[in-house]
Amino acid sequence: MVTTNRLVLSGTVCKTPVRKVSPSGIPHCQFVLEHRSTQQEAGFSRQTWCRMPIVVSGQQSQALTHSITVGSQLTVEGFISCHQGRNGLNKLVLHAEQIEFIDSGD
């Protein structure tokens, strides 16, 4: 059985982080990361774009999330999972296990 589930995505935070605490007392921070890049596919350049919902869970990660604002440039590493929205539709969500701020060089 194949069990690999890893994703690394860099981009810009495009929606204000929302902080919540679950009924079991676990803090969560949710935001959306927008990625834009040029990738090579079959020998051709291709413009890529996506918006990925990010969830950061656990007490040890929450101090870092308070520095995340709209416009923050990040690299996020973690695993993906499916979440069902209130409308009943499923969406992929990246559960962050490591977050690094990208220095803009300013």
UniProtKB/Swiss-Prot annotation:
- Record's GO cellular component terms: nucleoid; primosome complex
Write out the GO biological process terms.
DNA replication; DNA replication, synthesis of primer
Which is a Pfam family this sequence falls into?
A: SSB_1
Tell me the superkingdom of the source.
Bacteria
Ligase as a keyword of this entry, yes or no, is no
Identify its protein family. Answer: Belongs to the PriB family.
Q: What is the stated purpose of this protein?
A: Involved in the restart of stalled replication forks, which reloads the replicative helicase on sites other than the origin of replication; the PriA-PriB pathway is the major replication restart pathway. During primosome assembly it facilitates complex formation between PriA and DnaT on DNA; stabilizes PriA on DNA. Stimulates the DNA unwinding activity of PriA helicase.
Q: What is this protein called?
A: Replication restart protein PriB
**What is the protein's species of origin?**
Yersinia pestis
Q: Which gene encodes it?
A: priB
